[in-house]
Amino acid sequence: MARLRRRLWAWLLAGFLTIAALTLYQAERTGRSEPVAGSCPESALECPGEEKPLPLPVPVEPSASPSASASPSPSATPASPSPTPPPGSSAPPPSSAPGPACNATSPGACGFPDSRSTGPRIALKRHDTGNMSIKTDGTVIKGWDIYGSLDVYADNVTIIDSRITSTNWWGVNLRPGFKGLRVLHTTITAVPGKGPDNGGVNYAVSNMGESSVEVGWCDVSVFGNALSMGQGDLHDNYVHDIVAFRNLGGEWQHTDAVISGGGNKGRLTVRHNTLLNSVPIDKGASAALGLFADTGVVSNVIVDNNWLAGGAYALYGGGPGATGILVTDNVFSTQYHPKSGLYGAVAAWNAGGAGNVWRGNRMSDGRPVVPEPSP
């Protein structure tokens, strides 16, 4: 009898322990027995039970490959560039609606290139090259602090993340018959009074040939006709502090931040640059951007989303006979003159030219810019 009682108590105890174990197991699974969690540490990348915040947009710095065969990152462009109307069609009339105003003296604050977004991004090593000729295809110059100039007799030459201080006619020059020159993230300047044109210097980048030259994210100063070419891709550059000089003929040299003389064999694209010409009119200032029919008819040019200031007129638009000229969404700053240029924002605009488009251009205070009728 005693043995039976002991067995009964043993079974009861075993059952009780089994029930308790099952209860604890269930509590562990449901979390009811977990202690209250402490606050998530600030160093944690993500806290349990919290929704991830949406990522903030991060600006991506454009970069270029140091290899001559790789293409550099393209410049930021509008999502839908303006289409070119077919020849003979009527371009839409210029908009008269005001645009947003911006500080006339701060292109960088308004989203345009300045000293902070242009020039080399790496440490430089000094190279006293003098006036050096490049004759090897695919040459890459990177991280050089050059005292001299570069005369290019080769294809697919890349100059990137460098600085050029010239006392020659140019900083970089592409000779006829060669192609593929790219000048990126480079400061190009000169020593005033030390150039060959009676102390003056003329071209930061010159294209003597018929192929396109790319100049992007460059900080350019001093040169009288800073970026000079018939065809090319000029984007995200900061051209400023042009220095006036009397040339070998004894006359004040005409100055322009960008100049093209017409007769071009390919497209010239001038997009998202800051182009400043602070030279006084009586000392030679022509334009911030001059499209002149000096050597032939001006055609096939895109002028889009630039900041322009200075000159007699800030923009010369190609003159009679100019065709395929798209001038869109540019800001004409009053930094030097109330009208952007001394006499106005634009001259020599051929409104009736086939494929010519004028749209979305405004003063820095938001007023629309409408060209004067052609004479």
Question: Where are each of the predicted segments found?
Answer:
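Secretory targeting and sorting signals
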Residues: 3-27, 79
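N-terminal low-complexity, Pro/Thr-rich disordered segments
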Residues: 22-120
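Short, electropositive alpha-helical surface patch
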Residues: 90, 294-297
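Acidic, glycine- and Ser/Thr-rich low-complexity intrinsically disordered tracts
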Residues: 97-128, 323-324, 328, 334-375
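N-terminal carbohydrate-binding/catalytic regions of secreted carbohydrate-active enzymes
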Residues: 106-189
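Short, basic/low-complexity N-terminal boundary segments at the transition from targeting/disordered tails
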Residues: 111-118, 201-212
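Extracellular beta-strand/beta-solenoid scaffold signature
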Residues: 126-129, 146-148, 166-175, 192-207, ...
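Right-handed parallel beta-helix
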Residues: 138-145, 156-166, 178-192, 209-222, ...
